Amino acid sequence: MSEPVVDTAELSAEEKKRLLRERRQAKMSKGKATARLNNILSQGSSVKTSGVKSVLDQEKEATSSHDDDPEIQDITEITTPPPRTPPIGEDAPQDIDKIFQTMLQQQQQRGQGANTADDPFAQIMKMFNQTEGPDSLINEGSASTQDPTEIKYHQELLEYNTYNQKLWKFRFLLVRVLVTLFNFFYHYTSISDFHASNYAYVRDLSSEEYPVRDFFTWFATSEVVLVAAYYSVFHSLGLFHAANQNSIILKVMSMGSMILPQLESYKPLVARFLGYYELLGIVLGGLSLVIVLFGLLSFAN
């Protein structure tokens, strides 16, 4: 399309400059800016220069925008949190049981051929390495083993001993309660003066001098028989002394023996005392039930 013819007489000086500038830019945009520049620079010279290149003919570098969003974005990269990186100089966390196990093995290797009974560090490691519960049946050599089959066996044995101990305690408790209730209601129905009261004159109305003597005789006899059977069964099953290993007193003595080794010699005596104290607790429990029964009976009088 040809450019319109404009009468230059009617144009002002500013419009003429604008038209010249537009014509010059139109010529430059056709890719001949470099040739025209070299032609201008070569005027008046016998040698034409061709080493100059116009900025209009230079190729523009493609600029990449970092702010453009990708066409497809994987949401899992945003929703999945990155793995925790430990601080510099810090390794991955280890199992505390494995750490104590390794320290105990190293201490045992150092103490081979020497007496480590007075070594506080070795005693601390043994105390941490022992498993809680009635596991005194497990020797110290098996506690330091790494065989998974043997470890599983000891865990099952520990669970069985705990279950067996609770089962036998429940059985004896049930028998004691039934025997005491039968003894009480038998004498209550067979003896007319078998009653209790808060008032002295009511108790003095009894025709017999000791109306509850037979009841307490049978009660004491049954308690002695049940306590003896309890001790015999638990001792034969190996649960009598094992049940006291979790006592807070023995744990405190184990910790104190690291400072005072003499306490270690008193632990068997304390464990035996705790066992007999448990037998005494059985008798006290039966007496408590009798007191409750007589207290309920006193409301009727």
From Swiss-Prot:
Residues 56-67 have a biased composition (Basic and acidic residues). GO terms for cellular component: endoplasmic reticulum membrane; GET complex; Golgi membrane. It is found in: Endoplasmic reticulum membrane; Golgi apparatus membrane. This is Golgi to ER traffic protein 2. Its main location: endoplasmic reticulum. It is a multi-pass membrane protein. GO terms for biological process: protein insertion into ER membrane; retrograde vesicle-mediated transport, Golgi to endoplasmic reticulum.
